[in-house]
Amino acid sequence: MLSGYDNVDVAKIDGNHPHDSILQFFAIAKANINQYDNIFIDNLTHYQKLWLLKKGESTKSGMPEIKDYALLDNHLLKVVETFNALDANVIFTAWETTRHITHDDGQQYTQFIPDIRDKIVNHIMGIVHVVARLVTKADGTRGFMLEGDQSIYAKNHIDQRNGCLQRELLEVNHDEGSKK
């Protein structure tokens, strides 16, 4: 989607070697970080599936083993932490899923969240500064919800915006001269 724009470099994860590929991408990003204001990882949902598929290739059943899920959880947390340490805006995308929540009083609702493994989705959402939900209005305008409610998990720890147009997401902290 961004390929072909000025000042945009696109690297693709090697589906046959997703683990090594993300590590190589990090090494390149770190070595060249002074050339980038923003780094996008698109997307964590697909990456975790590729990672588990690769693990499954080495089993008799062709399916990942139980231990692989714990390894993936640790790996994803490290990926997010490691990329977040770079001196750039790091944006992780994920597909969306829902989870059903029942309160002690019996009230039930459905919450939209990033499609990341249940065991770590809360942790990952907790260690990033912004969790946003992309929405499209009837007129085609796309924007991000930056403040959540019980049905949408969203947060914005960078500024006071509750939402923004898609093109405005990274228009933050220009007055302070900071990338982040």
Spell out what each predicted region is:
Residues Y5-N7, A85, M125-G126:
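Short, well-ordered coil/turn elements that cap or connect secondary structure elements
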Residues A11, I91, H129-A132:
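Hydrophobic/aromatic beta-strand patches that form the interior of the parallel beta-sheet core
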Residues I28, Y47-L50, T82, I127, ...:
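Conserved, well-folded catalytic cores of nucleic-acid-processing
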Residues N38-H123:
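P-loop NTPase motor core
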Residues M1-I41, T45-L50:
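Conserved P-loop
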Residues T98-K180:
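Conserved GTP-binding G-domain of TRAFAC-class P-loop NTPases and closely related GTPase folds
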